[in-house]
Swiss-Prot record:
Taxonomic lineage: Bacteria, Bacillati, Bacillota, Bacilli, Lactobacillales
Domain (Core-binding (CB)): residue spans on this chain: 1-72
Compartments where located: Cytoplasm
UniProt-annotated catalytic positions: 149, 212, 244
Molecular functions (GO terms): DNA binding; tyrosine-based site-specific recombinase activity
Protein name: Tyrosine recombinase XerD-like
Job description of the protein: Putative tyrosine recombinase. Not involved in the cutting and rejoining of the recombining DNA molecules on dif(SL) site.
GO CC term (a single one): cytoplasm
Domain Tyr recombinase stretches: 84-246
Alphabetical keyword list: Cytoplasm, DNA integration, DNA recombination, DNA-binding
PROSITE patterns the UniProt entry points to: CB (PS51900), TYR_RECOMBINASE (PS51898)
């Protein structure tokens, strides 16, 4: 299995730090299961994660699930296994608390899904707005995005941690940020890309709407008033934001 771990890591385009992280987590996984994958061994491994914090557990589960899929895809495993996080964040918690989603900025097999998630999380955009984003809407000199919708124009500041992932997409051919043969992708494509990315990060409970809610909570924490936030979101009225300011 050690060779399988090395082959798996080599198959992914990872930074040095990410390679070390994957290797450490999967080596730990190997030691616990003894190189044999079955339901009992996986249950034993999952039990061993109880001592770790939720963020660390999610990282380890993500690495192991990707590795298990790799083994299944190659035919090494005859049965498909997938570990689930037992301590799920409830919908109530998601609505009321800012989540630690720093793993969204790490390596992924779904770069389009990651960019969609980060555009929602960082700018509060809806999937429909993202689907219509033109590269000309971005000013990379001043790091701003201009969006015009329903005769309302808003200027959004691009966060520094979003730029590396965004610039990579802006350098590709085409007028739209996301397009195929000059045409925008379907709504189902955006949904699938985002879902695949969220599954990879063990955040299956999240949706585009809940990611947008994270943007709202963060902006409120940063001191934005209800009126200011409604302008950032392109809302005609701030009424729908009232519940966040009670």
């Amino acid at each position: 299995m050690i060779n399988d771990i090395n082959n798996f890591i080599e198959s992914k385009k990872l930074s040095l730090n990410s390679r070390k992280s994957y290797h450490y987590d999967l080596k730990q996984f190997y030691k616990i299961i003894g190189g044999h994958v079955n339901s009992e061994k996986l249950a034993l491994y999952q039990q061993s994660l109880s001592e770790f914090k939720l963020t660390a557990r999610k990282r380890k589960l993500s690495a192991v699930n990707q590795f298990l899929f790799f083994l299944y895809n190659r035919g090494t495993l005859k049965e498909f296994y997938r570990l689930q996080e037992t301590e799920k964040i409830t919908l109530t918690q998601t609505k009321s608390q800012i989540m630690d989603l720093s793993n969204f900025y790490q390596d992924t097999d779904y770069p389009s899904g990651r960019l969609i998630a980060l555009l929602i999380l960082s700018l509060g955009l809806t999937p429909a707005e993202i689907a219509n984003l033109k590269k000309a809407d971005f000013d990379t000199t001043f790091n701003i995005l201009s969006i015009e919708k329903s005769q309302m124009k808003r200027i959004l500041k691009l966060p520094e941690n979003l730029l590396p992932f965004l610039l990579e997409s802006l350098e590709e051919d085409g007028d739209l940020v996301f397009e195929h043969n000059g045409k925008p992708y379907s709504r189902q494509w955006f949904f699938n890309q985002l879902t695949d990315f969220l599954n990879e990060k063990n955040e299956q409970q999240l949706t585009a709407q809940l990611l947008r809610e994270q943007f709202i909570l963060k902006q409120k924490e940063n001191g934005k008033t209800m009126t200011e936030l409604s302008r950032l979101l392109g809302l005609k009225t701030p009424i729908t934001l009232e519940r966040y300011y009670r």
